[in-house]
Amino acid sequence: MTRTLEGLLVDPVDGARAGALLLENGLIAGVEARPGGPEEPVIMPGFVDLQIYDWEPARAQGVTGYLATVGTSAPGVVERFLETLPDDPSCLGAHVEGPYLNPDAAGAQAAEHIRPVDARELGGWLSTGRVRMVTLAPELHGAFAAIEQIALAGGIPALGHTATNHRTAWLAIDEGARFATHVWNAMSGFRARAPGAIGAFLEDERITLGLNADGRHLHPATEELTVRAAGPRRIALTSDLVRPPQELPNGKLLGGDRCGAALVRRMAARFGLAESATMASLVPAELLGLTDRGRLVPGFRADLAILDGSLEPLETLVAGTSVWRRDEP
């Protein structure tokens, strides 16, 4: 199938320019600059979300790839979750958030199911080949061995729900941790003489920061500081999407209510279109090893988010096939 799309092409590396994409057999076959051409719709690489609990609404927000996420649960729940991952070309695997977390940083996770690191349980999950990311607290006994176990199985060790100090966080990165789950939330903060996990995450260029930029989880100034300190090439916009999101009696937030284009709109207003595409598309795709996604260049898969001039979604394409389209009035 062949299709030509014309509008404002937003590539994380080449920037935003008027042009056209030629799509053939699920791939981007050609890219043509058209100076003076139309600047709507806005065409961006499809968004990739590394932490999403409720993925059904995601394609309507331009999300073309996601990690289906399961939280801290009773024994046996993760196994059943992995057996029933959605049969969806956009599902890139699972993110297991917990249960090896610090109870003092449980946040909205089910504290009653937090438990010590269990190498046998973890190995069972990893043996399915469906787990792409596991979030754990690095200060737990056995956490460093678990980080190595995850990495050797081809997964991404992620750090989160932690009260660790700066040194332990840094050592965990040295051990192989490569992602910070919803940075700032449910983790030790930054102080003048005790920079905590945050200090290590901002400092160390080997780790990617999951930023929930929905306007609820973080103050806008915190979002700004994080992007400016780490740079867009180390930020992956994540949604933690749950329907409906809840505020628990202890004031903790359970999940987010915005994903994909809704996050991009907030970031683009402050950092620009190309930088937003970097954080929403290229960085998470690269972290997952998806070398054919996240850019608008020939040979890449035609996973696209097509937006109007206000960055509201118009259409979502996965491998060149339309999977969602906004109804016209």
What does each of the following model-derived ranges do?
Residues Y53-F81, S90-N102, G129-E139, A143, ...:
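Divalent metal-dependent hydrolysis catalytic cores, especially in the metallo-beta-lactamase
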Residues G15-E24:
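A conserved glycine-rich beta-strand in the N-terminal activation segment of trypsin-fold
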Residues P75-V77, A137-A151, H166-R167, F190-G199, ...:
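Active-site-adjacent beta->alpha loops and helix N-cap segments on the catalytic face
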Residues E286, L296-P329:
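C-terminal cap of metal-dependent C-N hydrolases
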Residues P45-G46, R59-L67, N102-T128, W170-M187, ...:
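Active-site gating loops and adjacent loop-to-helix segments of metal-dependent hydrolytic enzymes
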Residues G7-L8, N25-G26, G320:
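Glycine-centered positions in the ABC transporter ATPase nucleotide-binding domain
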Residues A200-L209, V227-F300, L304-L307:
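His/Asp/Glu-enriched, well-ordered alpha-helical/loop segment
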